[in-house]
Amino acid sequence: DALTPLTTRVLEAADRAKRTLDAGVTSIRDIGGTPRGFKLAAQRGLFPSPRMNIAVSIISQTGGHGDYALPSGITHPWMAAMLGYQTEWPNSVGDGIEGVTRVARETFRAGADFLKICTTGGLSLPDEDPNHTQFIVEEIKAMVAEAKAHGSYVAAHAQGLQGIKNALEGGVRSIEHGYFMDEEVADQMVAQGTYLVPTAHLTNGRLRRKAEDPASLPEDVIARSNTVADNLKMAYEKGVTIAMGTDVGVAEHGTNAEDLTALVDLTGMSPMQAIVAATRTASECNRKDHEFGTLTVGKLADLLIVDGDPLADISMLENKAHLLMIMQGGNAHKDLINS
């Protein structure tokens, strides 16, 4: 919150990074919020952490999903503390070709490895609607062009149908969420080679909760969750390339393996296919497959040794007690085998 000193927030973030590594996640793509200095500290080994690729900020149009200025004129407490440190988190709100190009360049200057933009509203705030489109196609194309100029790419928060279409027309590399896509969009994603990161744990959790207690959630929430689940299964069956990813702020840090279970439950993936979505495919999405993502000679030695069979029960990976060894870059972060 806005009353917490920045130094406290940094130490809290370091603890969250350790929890994520403790869960067996050796590399992450942080899609908004992590500044370059934090990544540098992790690289220097100042605290245990997954290696990071970072977007630094979430780029938004004025009044969009990543604009935290409230109608009252007050900045939302989520971001108020951050926005006082403009050298770490540059302005991330832009409009028009010139405006978004400048924001993109400033974001790369601040240390971003890629750009995260919002082409729709979201579901987390009462005044948002995922069906509202954000950024026109020409603005999206301008940011994609700027990313390409930096040898990078754009990931798009996109939930509603038209905003997903706009993001695809603009040339983004990955669609984050993609909840309300249709078959035409799925076909286009296959044709363009666009990745889908469905952040499926929330939907799966809601449907499980409904099965256990039918009265626990409103009917409109269940109906929406069923639609999202149906669309994800459709996308998988049509051959959309799916990379596993979580949604921080909705999921606790260190619970990443819940998304593996969700992919198996919602799409019909085998446990091995879900593991591939979290390793090889995720590294390809992040353009890091030459460094990690598979057990290949010459790549970084990241591996887990577990005391069970995740191919028989993928959910076992949610329990950290089952992780006997976590190796990151050839170094054992956790080793219960030789200790």
What are these regions (language model features)?
Residues 1-12, 90-91, 216-227:
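A short acidic, glycine-rich active-site loop
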Residues 1-44, 63-70, 138, 162, ...:
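Metal-associated gating/positioning segment near the N- to mid-region
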Residues 13, 100, 136, 140, ...:
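Aromatic/hydrophobic pocket-lining residues that form the small-molecule binding cavity
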Residues 24, 28-29, 115, 175, ...:
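Hydrophobic residues within beta-strands of alpha/beta enzymes
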Residues 43-216:
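Metal-coordinating catalytic core of metallo-dependent amide/deamination hydrolases
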Residues 149, 153, 213-216, 224-310:
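His/Asp/Glu-enriched, well-ordered alpha-helical/loop segment
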Residues 278-280, 297-339:
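C-terminal cap of metal-dependent C-N hydrolases
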